A protein has these predicted regions:
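Periplasmic plug
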Residues: 108-154, 182-185, 508, 526
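Outer-membrane beta-barrel translocator/receptor signature
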Residues: 130-133, 145-148, 159-170, 176-236, ...
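C-terminal beta-signal and terminal closure region of outer-membrane beta-barrel proteins
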Residues: 421, 428-429, 607, 620, ...
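C-terminal beta-signal and adjacent terminal beta-strands/loops
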Residues: 711-713, 806-809, 857-866, 888-941
Length: 941
C-alpha cells in the first residue's frame, strides 16, 4: 500500500512560510504553531528529483538542481507558469505574454539562453505535449494549480531523458493522491488600470477501495486582457536613433496618404488628391500604438488522473489533459510597397497632380510607373488569432516484481492542432488590378480588368479607400498545423541491488520508442506569395521515429571514513537509433558526490547530450529570396589576389572573366532556404563541479555553488549567403584563403553566365556555442521564539539564488573564427535578449500564526550593446532591480486570502531606439507594465 500524502500535499498549497522542497536530507522539527516546510520528505520517503530515475534528495545529486515550490507560484501572484520561470537566474527570457511580433500566442522556456529547442520540458518525468513542429512545449498548457514543485537541472541529461536536454531539464512535478476539494481564484491588474488577468481553478480528488485507488480531476480557466503599446508613454511612439546620441520619433515610410517616388523625388498625396513634398521627420507613419504590449489570452484547461493498486505487483494508472488556448497578436495596418502604374487622368487625383504626372509620362500612354508606399489603414489592423487545442493521454502500469526489482511501463499520445486566422492581409495582385483603371462608356472610373468584381482603389490620400475597395483587396488567410507524439516506454529498477558496505547500489534498465510527426498547411495565398501583410510560409509535412535503450547506475563506494563521510559515483548511458540521417547516437554521463563530512560535500559531473533535428528542421518547405550579396569573383581584387583567383577558377569561372561584371553587376544572389533532411544531431559536452555546505553549527542553513561549462558542436542554424561566400572564398582578413571549401558546393553557378544562382542556405550543422558560469544558492530557515497574531513563535525563511555568467560565445559558422561573439553582459542584433552577467533572486518570508509576509528582490546587472561597429543612442542598459511584496492571511482552516504588489517601485523599462527588440525595449526581460496588484483566495475542504 502507498502511504497517504494527503496532509503534506494540502499543506503545500497554503501560504504559510517559504517552501524548500527536497532541500534538506532530514527535516527539522518545527516549533508549535509555526508551519514546517510543506514539501520536505516524510520519514522514509524518497523524493525522485529530476536528473535521476533512481530517486534521492536534491542535495545528494551529482548534478546541480534548483527547485521551485508551489508556494513560490502562489507568492508570485502570477497566473501563468511563464511569469514565474522567466525570473529564475538560470533562464533567459524567451517567448512570453509580452511577445507580439514575433509571438504566436505561446510561452517557452530557455535555459542558459541556448534556445527553447535545447531545453527539455517534462511533466512527472515524461515528455509533454508540444505546440508546433519545433517540438517545444508551450508553458501555457501546464496547469499551474496542480504543480507541487518544479525541478530545474543544469546541463546535458540526454543519457537519462533523451534528445533535447542540452541546456538542461525543467520537470514539473504534479500533485498526486489528492483527496478533497481545493479551489483558487486570482485576479491581477496593473496600476494603470489595464491588463486585467483572472485565473480560477478547482481540484477535486478522492480515494477509493480503502485507499488502494485515487482519482483527481482539475479544471482551470484564465482570461488575460490585452494592452496596446499606446497605453504606455515609452511605447506609444516608435523611437529611432537620431544619429547624434539621442532618440527621436520614428516610423515607417509607408504612410496613410501614400508616398510616391519618381525621378528620385519623394512626394505624398493629400486627401483631395493633391501632392506635396514628403518629409520623413514629420510624415512617417507611427506604427507603434496598434501593437500589443500584452497579448490577450483565454485558456481552458482540464486534467484528470487516476491510479489503482491491484496488488503489490501491479498498479495501473492513467492521466489525460485537454487544453484550449486562444491568443491574439496585432500589428499596424498592412504597408504596401511596390512598383505600380498610376493613371495620370484618374479622377481620384487633383488637377495639379494630374498635370505633374502627365509631365512625367514620356511615352504618353496615360500611365506613369512609380514606386508607392501606402499604409492601408482603411483595411484595418493586421490580426493573427491563434486557436490552439491540445490533448494528451497516458496509460501505464507499475509494480514490485520481487527481489527489490520494480517496473514501470507506459504509453502516451499527444496531439496539438493550431489554427491561425489572419485578418488585415491584402492581395498584391488585387491591389495592382484595382490601381489599373480606365473609364467606361458612361464616363465612370472602373478597373481596366473588371474580373472578380474589381473596385477602383483610391490610394491618393489618407482615408480615401472606399469600403468596397477595401473589401476587394482584403484576403482572408487561415493556416493549420498539427504536431503529434507517441511514446512507449518501459523500465525496471532496483534501488538495493547489493551493498558494497557504503550503501545500496541502484540500477535502472529501460527502453523507449518515440515517434514525432508534424504538418503545416499554410493558406494558398500565403504560400503563393500573393499576401501582403504577414510573412509568407511554405508547407511542412514529415516525421521520424527513434528507438532507444538506456541504463543508469548509482554506486556508493565508501562511507563513514575519515574525510569520507560518503563517496558515490553514478553513470548513465543511452543508445538511440533515429530513422533520420542521425542514425546511431550515443549519450552518456558520469558523476561523483564526495561528502568529506556531514557539513561539506563536493560534486561533479560530465555529460554528453544531443539535440536531434526537429520535424521543422528536417522538413520545412523550401523558399526563395534575394539577399544582398556580391560574387567575389566579379571584384577587381579577384584579378590580383592569387588565392581568390585560384578559388574562382576552381569553382568554374573562366580566367578571362574573373574581375568582370559577368553577372550583370548584380548586388543580390538568388538563395534557397528551408529544412534539410540530411541534418545530423547537435552534440554537447557539459562539465559541472560544485560544493554543498550544510553546517551543523547553523541548523537550517544550506549553501550550494556549482560551476558549469557547456560546449555545443554541430549547432543547427542557417549560414547566410554572405557567410557562405566567405567560407568558400575567404576574405580580406585571411588573404582570401578559403575557410572551408566544402561550402563551395552550396554556391552553384549558371552553366552559361557563370553567375552564382540558387545558393543553398538551408539549415545545416554549422555553428557552435560555448558557455560557462556559476550557479549559487543559499537558504536559511530560522525558527523564532516570538510571534504575533496569537502565536508565540514564528519563522523566518531566506533564499538567495543567483547566476554569474562568465562567457557565452556564439558562432553561426564554426569554420569562420572571427564570427564568434561573446554575448555575456551584452544584448543587441546578434545576441538578442540581454545576457546579464549577474542574475539574482532573493526572497525573505516571515510567518507567524495566520499571517505570512514575503518580499522578493530581483536583480539584473548592466548590459552593453553587442555591435562594436555601430554607435547607438543607447549603448548600455543599466542594472535593474525589482521588488515584490506578498501578504497571506489564513482566515480559518481551509481558507487563505492573499494580496500582493509586483514591481513595488514602478520601475519602468529601458527605452531604446535602433537596437530595441520591440515596443522600444526588451519587454520579455524588463517589466513592461509597471506596478501591479493581485489578490487571490484559496479554499480547501
Amino acid at each position: 500500500m502507498r502511504p497517504d500524502f494527503r496532509k503534506r500535499l494540502l499543506a503545500s498549497t497554503l501560504l504559510l512560510g517559504m517552501g524548500t522542497p527536497a532541500l534538506a536530507q532530514t527535516a527539522t522539527p518545527a516549533p508549535t504553531e509555526v508551519p514546517a516546510d510543506p514539501a520536505a520528505p516524510a520519514d522514509g520517503d524518497t523524493i525522485v528529483v529530476t536528473g535521476s530515475r533512481l530517486g534521492g534528495l536534491q542535495l545528494d545529486q551529482a548534478a546541480p538542481i534548483a527547485v521551485v515550490s508551489a508556494q513560490d507560484f502562489a507568492l508570485s501572484g502570477q497566473t501563468n507558469v511563464e511569469n514565474v520561470l522567466k525570473d529564475l537566474p538560470q533562464l533567459v527570457p524567451s517567448t512570453t505574454g509580452a511577445s507580439n511580433n514575433p509571438g504566436g500566442g505561446v510561452a517557452t522556456a530557455n535555459l542558459r539562453g541556448l534556445g527553447s529547442t535545447r531545453t527539455l520540458v517534462l511533466v512527472d518525468n515524461r515528455r509533454y505535449v508540444a505546440y508546433d513542429s519545433n517540438q517545444v512545449v508551450d508553458l501555457n498548457t501546464i496547469p499551474a494549480g496542480l504543480i507541487e514543485r518544479v525541478d530545474i537541472v543544469s546541463g546535458g541529461r540526454s543519457a537519462v531523458y533523451g534528445s533535447d536536454a542540452i541546456a538542461g531539464v525543467i520537470n514539473f512535478v504534479m500533485k498526486k493522491d489528492f483527496s478533497g476539494v481545493q479551489a483558487n481564484a486570482n485576479y491581477r491588474i496593473n496600476e494603470a488600470g489595464d491588463g486585467g488577468n483572472f485565473n480560477g481553478n478547482i481540484l477535486l480528488g478522492g480515494n477509493f477501495e480503502d485507499g488502494r485507488g485515487n482519482a483527481t480531476i482539475y479544471f482551470d480557466y484564465t482570461k488575460r486582457n490585452g494592452i496596446l503599446q499606446s497605453a504606455r508613454d515609452y511605447s506609444k511612439q516608435a523611437q529611432v536613433d537620431d544619429g547624434d546620441g539621442g532618440l527621436i520619433a520614428g516610423g515607417s515610410g509607408s504612410i496613410e496618404g501614400t508616398r510616391f517616388a519618381i525621378g528620385g523625388v519623394n512626394r505624398k498625396f493629400g486627401t483631395d488628391g493633391s501632392y506635396s513634398a514628403y518629409n520623413s521627420a514629420t510624415d512617417a507613419y507611427n506604427y507603434a500604438p496598434s501593437n500589443y504590449l500584452q497579448v490577450p489570452q483565454e485558456r481552458f484547461l482540464m486534467s484528470a488522473q487516476t491510479h489503482y493498486e491491484v496488488s503489490d505487483a501491479l498498479t495501473v494508472y492513467a492521466e489525460g489533459q485537454f487544453i484550449n488556448n486562444r491568443v491574439k497578436n496585432q500589428l499596424a495596418p498592412t504597408p504596401f510597397t511596390g512598383s505600380v502604374a498610376i493613371d495620370v487622368d484618374s479622377s481620384f487625383l487633383s488637377a495639379s497632380s494630374q498635370s505633374l504626372l502627365r509631365g512625367l509620362d514620356p511615352d504618353g500612354d496615360g500611365y506613369v510607373t512609380s514606386t508607392i508606399y501606402r499604409r492601408l489603414t482603411e483595411v484595418g489592423n493586421r490580426v493573427s488569432s491563434n486557436d490552439n487545442s491540445a490533448y494528451r493521454a497516458v496509460l501505464g502500469a507499475k509494480g514490485d516484481i520481487g527481489g527489490g526489482w520494480n517496473y514501470d511501463a507506459y504509453y502516451s499520445y499527444s496531439r496539438t492542432k493550431s489554427i491561425e486566422t489572419q485578418s488585415g492581409n491584402v492581395s498584391r495582385s488585387r491591389v495592382l488590378q484595382a490601381l489599373r483603371t480606365t473609364y467606361d462608356a458612361n464616363g465612370n472610373l472602373v478597373c481596366s480588368d473588371t474580373s472578380n468584381g474589381c473596385v477602383p482603389l483610391n490610394i491618393y490620400g489618407a482615408g480615401n479607400i472606399s469600403a468596397a475597395a477595401a473589401a476587394f483587396i482584403t484576403i482572408p488567410v487561415q493556416n493549420v498545423s498539427t504536431i503529434s507524439e507517441q511514446v512507449a516506454s518501459a523500465s525496471i529498477s532496483n534501488r538495493n541491488l547489493f551493498d558494497l558496505g557504503a550503501g545500496p547500489v541502484g540500477i535502472v534498465f529501460g527502453t523507449e520508442y518515440r515517434r514525432e510527426h508534424g504538418n503545416y498547411s499554410p493558406d494558398f495565398a500565403l504560400s503563393s506569395g500573393d499576401v501582403v501583410g504577414f510573412n509568407g510560409g511554405e508547407g511542412l509535412g514529415g516525421g521520424y521515429n527513434v528507438k532507444e535503450a538506456y541504463t543508469e547506475l548509482a554506486v556508493p563506494l565508501l562511507a563513514d571514513l575519515p574525510f569520507i563521510k560518503k563517496l558515490e559515483v553514478n553513470g548513465a548511458y543511452r543508445y538511440s537509433y533515429y530513422s533520420t540521417a542521425a542514425k546511431s547516437v550515443n549519450t552518456y554521463s558520469g558523476g561523483v558526490v564526495w561528502s568529506l563530512i556531514s557539513d561539506l560535500s563536493l560534486r561533479g559531473q560530465y555529460s554528453r547530450a544531443v539535440r536531434a533535428p526537429t520535424v521543422s528542421d528536417l522538413f520545412s518547405g523550401a523558399s526563395q529570396d534575394f539577399p544582398a550579396a556580391t560574387d567575389p569573383c566579379t571584384t577587381a581584387i579577384a584579378r590580383t589576389n592569387t588565392n581568390l583567383n585560384a578559388s574562382c577558377v576552381a569553382n568554374g569561372v573562366p580566367a578571362s572573366l574573373i574581375g568582370t561584371a559577368y553577372d550583370g553587376g548584380s548586388t543580390q544572389i538568388q538563395t534557397i532556404n528551408g529544412g534539410n533532411p540530411a541534418l545530423r544531431e547537435e552534440t554537447s559536452d557539459t562539465y559541472t563541479a560544485g560544493i554543498v555546505l550544510q553546517p551543523r553549527f547553523l541548523p537550517g542553513f544550506t549553501f550550494t555553488a556549482d560551476y558549469y561549462k557547456i560546449k555545443i558542436a554541430n549547432y543547427i542554424s542557417t549560414v547566410g549567403t554572405t557567410n557562405l561566400i566567405r567560407a568558400c572564398y575567404g576574405d580580406a582578413d585571411n588573404g582570401y584563403t578559403p575557410y572551408d571549401s566544402s561550402y563551395c558546393s552550396s554556391l552553384p553557378r549558371d552553366a552559361n553566365s557563370y553567375a552564382i544562382t540558387d545558393a543553398t542556405n538551408t539549415l545545416a550543422n554549422t555553428g557552435g556555442v560555448n558557455t560557462r558560469g556559476v550557479d549559487f544558492e543559499a537558504r536559511y530557515s530560522l525558527p523564532l521564539d516570538f510571534g504575533a497574531f496569537g502565536s508565540t513563535t514564528s519563522r523566518l525563511d531566506l533564499r538567495v539564488s543567483g547566476t554569474r555568467l562568465i562567457a557565452f560565445d556564439y558562432n553561426p559558422v564554426a569554420a569562420i573564427p572571427d564570427l564568434t561573439i561573446n554575448c555575456a553582459g551584452k544584448f543587441g542584433q546578434t545576441c538578442g535578449n540581454p545576457y546579464a552577467k549577474w542574475r539574482l533572486s532573493t526572497r525573505a518570508t516571515y510567518a507567524t500564526g495566520p499571517v505570512t509576509v514575503s518580499v522578493l528582490y530581483r536583480h539584473l546587472s548592466a548590459v552593453k550593446d553587442d555591435d562594436s561597429a555601430t554607435v547607438y543612442a543607447v549603448e548600455k542598459i543599466k542594472a535593474y532591480d525589482y521588488f515584490d511584496l506578498t501578504a497571506a492571511f489564513k482566515i480559518q482552516d481551509g481558507f487563505t486570502w492573499s494580496v500582493g504588489v509586483n514591481n513595488i517601485f514602478n520601475k519602468q523599462p529601458p527605452v531604446l531606439g535602433d537596437n530595441q527588440q520591440q515596443a522600444n525595449t526588451y519587454p520579455s526581460t524588463y517589466d513592461p507594465y509597471g506596478r501591479a496588484f493581485f489578490v487571490s483566495t484559496n479554499v480547501e475542504f
